[in-house]
Design a protein with these regions (language model features):
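Short, small/polar residue-rich loop motifs at catalytic or cofactor-binding pockets
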Residues: 37-40
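A short, small-residue-rich loop immediately preceding and capping a beta-strand
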Residues: 86-95
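Short beta-strand segments
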Residues: 42-44, 94, 175-178
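Residues that line or immediately flank small-molecule/substrate-binding pockets and catalytic motifs
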Residues: 59, 95, 123
């Protein structure tokens, strides 16, 4: 009976993880045709199984999804209350948080500074400059990390980006008719 209860708890947790990741994917889709050559990324911040902030990467060169989710939480609750809510929260994002400064500061820094307890990401970033580095930085800062929730859907969403990063060529679709 105890084992069954533990299995039920894990299954329930898995379903919640999938639900929150599905929402992050839906948010990411809002960036379609606006963020290229960057990937489409969505983010949901959750505290006590409730969404307290959400965001997506809205435009090339603009703030990333994680930062927009934090800003969304601050707009909803005010900065002081939001900072308390974000501390110890879980962050769901369809792609590994960036760990390099390019057009924007690394998202890993903001995640750590805000005291986020756990990061659940759908898949690693295929960009060789990031691939796994964001995860290492978060773990070093004692942030729990879980990878692979709805991984197939997360990779499919950004298949153009993945092809460019992994194969150094554009994503090609061939249509043929007779």
């Amino acid at each position: 009976l105890l084992l069954q209860m533990e299995l039920n708890k894990r299954q329930e947790e898995k379903m919640k993880d999938q639900d929150f990741m599905a929402r992050a994917i839906e948010l990411a889709k809002k960036g379609r045709l606006k963020v290229q050559p960057n990937p489409m990324v969505g983010c949901v911040i959750v505290k006590e199984k409730k969404i307290i902030g959400e965001g997506w990467h809205k435009s090339f060169g603009g703030a990333h999804a994680e930062i927009n989710a934090i800003k969304n939480c601050k707009r909803k609750f005010g900065t002081k209350k939001a900072n308390k809510l974000i501390e110890g929260a879980d962050l769901y994002v369809n792609l590994e948080p960036c760990s390099i400064k390019k057009n924007t500061p690394p998202c890993t820094n903001s995640i750590i500074q805000h005291g986020i307890r756990k990061v659940i990401c759908g898949t690693l970033d295929p960009n060789p400059a990031i691939n796994g580095q964001g995860i290492k930085i978060l773990k070093k800062a004692r942030v729990q990390v879980k990878i692979g929730i709805l991984q197939t859907e997360c990779k499919s969403l950004n298949r153009v980006f993945f092809t460019t990063q992994q194969k150094s060529r554009p994503y090609i679709i061939l249509k043929s008719a007779q």
